């Protein structure tokens, strides 16, 4: 059983000074020690909450959330993270704001940020748009702070864009670290990031891209498996290849789900839309081509239906390492005969892994809180120490 001091000591050995007053866009833009700092602070905050130690580092302030796509886990994880640190959350509903009347990104970003310490954005639907929008928001608030309009520049946390889903993948990784007993035990472990059938179309690429972009940094043997025609962004594949070369791991693409699952230590079967189709979809929306969008949707649904055999079955799970691979999913999963007739995973597999799946999801609030804390405090180790010394209980009578 670790103590809070153990986490503080570990934090003091890491170099993460560039995270202070900075933003979190993509995991591969961060150093290994910066990622380690996020996991360490996340674990420290979890330890504190579980041991009734207050983690309130803000007496006031706002966490602004903007979701341009549906969300349950990430929405509540962001709200939980802000609350954990003492911030209140205000959700920006663009449909009810002046954005609907043509307000510029620069103006909106500054107007919502007068007392904001963090802005969390999900914008994952359109290739080439989401991450770019987040940078535009950061540029606006940076200039606002420089011009003396804003007292402080709120940090931005990417809650999922068109390229990466860093809070999800960092939470996934922290779950893996705990399941395998430390980062040092991950080298050589086989992870299968595989496409799986879904009766819906247009699921973002950011989860598989985020997974291969992060897991390849751990010296793991990462296999990206999908039917032909379901490629991810080529630049992310290149990131994964370079990571694998640097860490002594491996990265390869397979068009065989069974090949990916064979002897795998970790499996992550999840549906996504082809990069080429998502790119075409973005262009059709930009052109206002509603008929073209409908046609593309029919084509993609028909294409998906050709690959219903890409499902995480009991038989496939038996072929994994000792038949006991760790099953991951960002949730919600398409479960056979539960949420749909045919989907990503058989019900018996999902039911067997339900508890670890929920545990996997539970890391996300702490990961987000850690990202915020590392961006807002120059010496988070000292902040954690002072919180412990105050001896204020989170819940006290």
Report the location of each language-model feature.
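A short helix->loop->beta-strand "cap" motif at the edges of active sites that frequently abuts
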Residues: 147-154, 220, 319-328
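Glycine-rich phosphate/diphosphate-binding loop of Rossmann-like nucleotide-binding domains
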Residues: 68-80, 177-291
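Conserved small/polar residues in nucleotide/adenosyl-binding loops
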Residues: 395-397
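Rossmann-fold NAD(P)-binding glycine/threonine-rich loop
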Residues: 293-358, 366
């Amino acid at each position: 059983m670790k103590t809070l001091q153990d986490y503080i000591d570990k934090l003091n050995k890491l170099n993460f000074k560039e995270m202070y007053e900075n933003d979190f866009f993509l995991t591969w833009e961060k150093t290994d020690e910066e990622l380690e700092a996020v996991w360490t602070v996340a674990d420290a905050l979890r330890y504190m909450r579980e041991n009734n130690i207050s983690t309130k580092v803000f007496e006031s302030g706002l966490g602004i959330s903007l979701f341009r796509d549906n969300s349950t886990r990430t929405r509540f994880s962001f709200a939980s993270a802000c609350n954990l640190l003492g911030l209140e959350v205000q959700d920006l509903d663009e449909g009810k704001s002046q954005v609907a009347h043509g307000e510029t990104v620069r103006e909106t970003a500054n107007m919502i940020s007068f007392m904001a310490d963090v802005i969390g954005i999900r914008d994952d639907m359109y290739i080439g748009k989401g991450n770019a929008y987040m940078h535009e928001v950061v540029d606006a608030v940076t200039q606002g702070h420089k011009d003396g309009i804003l007292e402080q520049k709120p940090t931005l946390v990417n809650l999922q864009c068109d390229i990466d889903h860093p809070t999800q993948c960092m939470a996934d990784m922290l779950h893996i670290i705990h399941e395998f007993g430390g980062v040092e035990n991950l080298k050589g472990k086989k992870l299968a990031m595989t496409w799986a059938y879904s009766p819906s179309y247009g699921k973002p690429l950011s989860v598989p891209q985020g997974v291969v972009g992060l897991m390849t940094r751990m010296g793991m043997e990462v296999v990206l498996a999908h039917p032909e025609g379901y490629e991810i962004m080529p630049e992310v594949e290149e990131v994964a290849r370079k990571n694998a070369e640097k860490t002594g791991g491996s990265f390869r693409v397979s068009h065989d789900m069974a090949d990916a699952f064979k002897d795998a230590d970790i499996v992550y079967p999840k549906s996504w839309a082809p990069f080429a189709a998502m790119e075409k979809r973005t262009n059709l929306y930009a052109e206002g081509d509603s008929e073209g969008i409908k046609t593309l949707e029919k084509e993609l649904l028909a294409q998906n239906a050709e690959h219903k055999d890409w499902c995480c079955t009991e038989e496939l799970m038996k072929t994994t390492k000792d038949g006991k691979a760790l099953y991951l999913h960002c949730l919600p999963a398409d479960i056979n005969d539960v949420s749909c007739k045919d989907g990503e995973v058989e019900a018996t597999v999902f039911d067997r892994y339900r508890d670890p799946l929920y545990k996997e999801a539970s890391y996300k609030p702490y990961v987000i809180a850690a990202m915020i804390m590392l961006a807002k405090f120059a010496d988070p180790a000292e902040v954690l120490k002072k919180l412990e010394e105050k001896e204020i209980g989170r819940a006290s009578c």
